[in-house]
Swiss-Prot record:
It comes from Clostridium botulinum (strain Langeland / NCTC 10281 / Type F). Residues 375-441 form the TRAM domain. Its main location: cytoplasm. This is Ribosomal protein uS12 methylthiotransferase RimO. Its EC number is 2.8.4.4.
Length: 445
């Protein structure tokens, strides 16, 4: 293929981002990558098909990119990702402007499909489903140079009643430890300091290929890689957290004292309807254990409000939990009715207006909790990875903050500080979600 200009628009989660980065590497061999789709002759949209708002964003983006065939330089429109895997037949009819459609296991066909279309105009529509294939290999990072996401497993075995991911991504399958370590070593050589481990469920890592959960072993091995400073864990199911994992987080200085626990709900009756393999008592017990065993640990969660049949009593129970447990970070999603899931067939679907009201109530409550938690940080000194500048301030994150979702620490510019540096910052002021401080040195003690 001649050096044709290609742009890739990536939507959705960071697992999708990794797929996009894998595609970019393959494309870079024979194409010129451009950031602005208006300049591109080939536009690739990597879609999300998880919840209704994500699907709408994906459809709107595809249609916008399709319009560039008339208004700009686009000759080939490629659509891939979770939406194409989930709605392959419907999309083909709905958007005839698509020239190539790939499922989540078809990225190896990307270059060849583009070449064929440019040569003959022949369209390609692949949507292979695989319970064995794992997308891995070299990537072109779309994150800042000091941070990278690393997927340790693909798919999911949980089959929660509201979630379509197992039907899109297949059953849970772990990557081999040696492949992950090789990837981390390559990333560290590129200057990456923060490794963020992701999967649909990171805590189940290894169960399928090693016969047991070995996330703690993986953390230990990654921490030995030269250049890696921080290792962050996302998507840790509380019921799967082992004592070995707790010990590793506690004793390994490179592992951030931070856990993302997607509990979704707290009422046992709602958890049962959701098909979750846990209980209120188990969730509260593991939170207490983590706080007792790991000093200074930050706990984040995501909640779903408006699940079918959610009563005022069940919602009050959730509010009481949020108020009593006071998790450090919290996000709320309104339940999204997804085709093909058993929850979509449940009676007593909740009105959108009630969902919005409940979402707002939880977030107002959490805002107050976060404000109080942040006040306690005044005077504390943190290691901060410097991310950028806004007006006359630098900003960055400490171990308590995951990229893009957890707030930032702002501090005055310092001529000795560069983006990507890890420095010490003393907190002087606090806001609801952000902190303000000064570079910590002899003068700021």
């Amino acid at each position: 293929m001649e050096k044709i200009k290609v742009a890739l628009v990536s939507l959705g989660c960071d697992k999708n981002r990794i797929d996009s980065e894998l595609m970019l590497y393959k494309l870079n061999e024979e194409a010129e990558l451009v950031k602005n789709p208006k300049e591109a002759q080939v536009i690739i949209v990597n879609t999300c098909g998880f919840i209704e708002t994500a699907k709408e964003e994906s459809i709107n983006t595809i249609l916008q990119m399709a319009s560039y065939k008339k208004t700009h330089n686009c000759k080939v429109l490629v659509v891939t990702g979770c939406l194409t895997q989930r709605y392959k037949g419907e999309l083909k009819e709905l958007i005839p402007e698509m020239d190539i459609m790939l499922g989540v296991n078809d990225y190896d066909k990307l270059l060849e499909s583009i070449k064929v279309f440019l040569k003959s105009g022949e369209k390609s529509f692949y949507h292979k489903y695989s319970d064995t294939k794992i997308n891995e290999g070299n990537r072109i990072l779309t994150t800042p140079t000091y941070t990278a996401y690393v997927r340790i497993a693909e798919g999911c075995n949980n089959f929660c009643t509201y979630c379509a991911i197992p039907r899109i991504r297949g059953k849970y399958r772990s990557r081999k430890k040696e492949n992950i370590l090789k990837e981390v070593e390559n990333l560290a050589k590129q200057g990456v300091k923060e490794i963020i481990l992701i999967a649909q469920d990171t805590t189940m890592y290894g169960i399928d290929i090693y016969g047991k959960k070995v996330l703690h072993e993986l953390l230990r091995d990654i921490s030995k890689v030269e250049g890696v400073k921080w290792i962050r864990l996302l998507y840790c199911y509380p019921e799967e957290i082992t004592k070995e994992l707790i010990e590793e987080i506690k004793n390994n200085d490179k592992v951030c004292k931070y856990l993302d626990l997607p509990i979704q709900q707290i009422s046992n009756s709602v958890l049962k309807r959701m098909g979750r393999k846990t209980t209120k008592e188990t969730i509260i017990d593991i939170i207490k254990k983590l706080r007792k065993e790991i000093e200074g640990i930050t706990l984040r969660t995501s909640l779903i409000v408006g699940f079918p049949g959610e009563t005022e009593g069940e919602f009050s129970e959730l509010k009481e939990f949020v108020s009593d447990v006071k998790l450090d970070k919290l996000g709320v999603f309104k339940y999204s009715k997804e085709e093909g899931t058993s929850a979509a067939l449940m009676e007593e679907q909740i009105d959108e207006e009630i969902k919005e009201k409940r979402e707002e109530e939880i977030m107002i409550l959490q805002q107050s909790i976060s404000k109080d938690i942040n006040k306690e940080k005044i005077g504390k000194i943190y290691e901060v990875i410097v991310e950028g500048t806004k007006e006359d301030m630098y900003y960055g994150r400490n171990y308590e903050m995951s990229p893009e979702i957890d707030g930032e620490i702002y501090f005055e510019k310092d001529e000795n500080v560069k983006i990507g540096d890890i420095i010490k910052v003393k907190v002087t002021h606090s806001l609801e979600y952000d902190l303000i401080g000064v570079v910590y040195n002899e003068l700021s003690k």
